[in-house]
Each structure stands twice: as structure tokens, then as C-alpha cells.
Amino acid sequence: MTVSLPLVFDAPRRGMPPRHLADLDAEQRRAAVAELGLPKFRADQIARQYYGRLEADPARMTDLPAPVREQIGAALFPRLLDVVKHVACDDGRTRKTLWRAGDGTLLESVLMRYADRNTLCISSQAGCGMACPFCATGQGGLNRNLSTAEIVDQVRAAAAALRDGAVAGGPGRLSNIVFMGMGEPLANYKRVVAAVRRITAPAPDGLGISQRNVVVSTVGLAPAIRKLADEGLSVTLAVSLHTPDDELRDTLVPVNNRWPVAEVLDAARYYADTTGRRVSVEYALIRDINDQPWRADMLGAKLHKALGSRVHVNVIPLNPTPGSKWDASPKPVEREFVRRVNEQGVPCTVRDTRGQEIAAACGQLAAEN
């Protein structure tokens, strides 16, 4: 096995859109409105339209005078994301959206309807620089970071689609957000944290989704995990571990060459200690690569030692990607792996995978037009 791409932590600075309302916190919104010569109360009025009514077109904000709509449209609502296409499966209850940003950059998000929740998987970067060889996004390389507004607007658009009954299953409410789409969220740290705050703040400052229903994933950027722990947020941390030993992880997750397993688990323990939140560990099970019984035993033992009862393992059957030489482990092997991890005192379940047939499942997002 070889790594075909280098790790990229510093994204190209090209293509970022102009300032948008969703890039700004409450104080910055008021300052931006004042710069336009408008009274400060307009800032909350505009924010209530965007976050509360899920309206992104100033021309439709009819409680504002027409001249104000034109003014704020030019200053605070640059073109962000246009739908290229929707693709659905699961009787329409799983819907992947391909977006085109203002500079032509392509990205994807996936909306999944369940009996008890509606979950949106969002992208934080266009592409990914972490170069994991079993992931289509990682093998495509990194185009650029997404702006805070580009991240937030994926959520606003999905919430509006659910509210309006545009997704199979009738009108509904968006309840859960997972930063598990394209990109390494903690490599776009500042914008992702700002987006989390906008997504979770109550209107008029945000979309009002509970922090406890937000998951931020990472391949293991240990210093950023510790930094996130100190942000005062209550989001769930998901660590994409994929193997408990450094020898294999150096290849499967190349960032392990910088922050090995022990360092990642130390950071995860700090996150659990600081936030009081249980950590999720993601494990893509690959036939004859990381599915051996001894690896299950090692995984359970290391996680129990590092995190005790504050960890849960999600086993993910490997999703196929174009040209991949790997495939998912057989079901008996998967069941034995889960059993052995549980035997070590660590809760372990197989994650319900949605969207495989439309290339919308974990590791499949490639933003192909």
C-alpha cells in the first residue's frame, strides 16, 4: 500500500467568497449594518430573516424597505452556493446535493431522514488534504477551505427544504448536523468553529440546532482537538481512527505520521475530560487490512484505557470508491470484530450506512458533476 498524495494542511487561499451575513457574529453584523448607514436594529431584522425564516434572498425579505433590500443584497449577500443537482435514494429519504460555489468550486452535502431525526452531513472543505487512500475525497486532493457562510448555508438550505416538504416524507425539522462530508474540519478550524456557533445559536443569531446534536469529525489533528475542547462547546467529537496500531495507521491515515495513535487518544481524553462529552471513534472495516481479531482486541483495550466509559465505536463497512483495491469485510468477520471490542468493555456497533448507491456514503463524496 502506498500513499499517492502528500498531506496538505494549508489550503490555497483562492476562491473564497466575499463577506456574507453568515460570516459575521452579532457584533460584526451590527457594525456592518452601521457601515451602510442603516440603524442597528436592521441587523437583527436581517438575521431573523436568514436564520429564523431561512430566507437567503434579500429581495424576498419584504419586511425591509426595497432600497434597504438592494443595499444589503449588494453588501451582505454575495452569491454563495447554487444547486447543480440533487440525487436521491432510499425512497427519496436520502438526498445528496451537489453545490457549485461562486468561483466554480464543487462540494456536496447529504440529507438523511430517519424515523426519529433528520441529519445533514456537511462539507467543511472542497476536497481534502489528508490523503487517506481508501477515501474518494482524500484521493481527490484539496481545492480550498469553505468559508463560514458556505458551511452554514448548506445547513440553512437543508432546513428550508425540510420545512417546505421538498424532501420525501413530508415537512420536517432539521435536527442533527455531522461534519463528515468533504474535508478535514479541524484543518479549517476557525471557520468551522464559527459555523458551529452560527448553526447552534438561537435566532436571530443562528439556526438553533442543539450543540449536542452536532458532530465534528477529525482524522486526528491532536493540537486542534485540544483547542476545540477549550472552546466551551458541547459538540460530539468523532475521531476517525480506523486502526489501533501506528504501523498500519501511518498508511491508512497518513496524518498519523505526525500525531500517532497515543497522542490522538490523549487529546481525545482531554476532550472528554474538559467537555464531559463521550467521544465517538469511527472505524472503517476493510477486508484483510484492519479487521483481524487481534486488532479488535487492541482497539478495545487502548480505548478502554484512554477513555473508560466515555467512548463509543462506530464500525463502518467500507464503502466502495472508483478504482479502489479494497472492499468491506465479510459480515461474519464484522460481527466478530464488534463482539471482541464490546468484550473489552467498549460499546461498539455497526453504523447504519446510507446512500452507497448514489455515492453519498462515508468516504464516497467526490463532487463529480
UniProtKB/Swiss-Prot annotation:
Its main location: cytoplasm. It holds the Pfam family Radical_SAM. Keywords: 4Fe-4S, Cytoplasm, Disulfide bond, Iron, Iron-sulfur, Metal-binding, Methyltransferase, rRNA processing, S-adenosyl-L-methionine, Transferase, tRNA processing. Its cofactor is [4Fe-4S] cluster. The active site is at 108 (proton acceptor), 362 (s-methylcysteine intermediate). GO terms for biological process: rRNA base methylation; tRNA methylation. S-adenosyl-L-methionine binds at residues 183-184, 217, 240-242, 319. InterPro entries: Aldolase_TIM (IPR013785), Methyltransferase_A (IPR040072), RNA_MTrfase_RlmN (IPR027492), rRNA_lsu_MTrfase_RlmN/Cfr (IPR004383), rSAM (IPR007197). GO terms for cellular component: cytoplasm. Residues 114-357 form the Radical SAM core domain. Its EC number is 2.1.1.192. It catalyses: adenosine(2503) in 23S rRNA + 2 reduced [2Fe-2S]-[ferredoxin] + 2 S-adenosyl-L-methionine = 2-methyladenosine(2503) in 23S rRNA + 5'-deoxyadenosine + L-methionine + 2 oxidized [2Fe-2S]-[ferredoxin] + S-adenosyl-L-homocysteine; adenosine(37) in tRNA + 2 reduced [2Fe-2S]-[ferredoxin] + 2 S-adenosyl-L-methionine = 2-methyladenosine(37) in tRNA + 5'-deoxyadenosine + L-methionine + 2 oxidized [2Fe-2S]-[ferredoxin] + S-adenosyl-L-homocysteine. [4Fe-4S] cluster binds at residues 128, 132, 135. Belongs to the radical SAM superfamily. RlmN family. Specifically methylates position 2 of adenine 2503 in 23S rRNA and position 2 of adenine 37 in tRNAs. This is Probable dual-specificity RNA methyltransferase RlmN. The gene is rlmN.
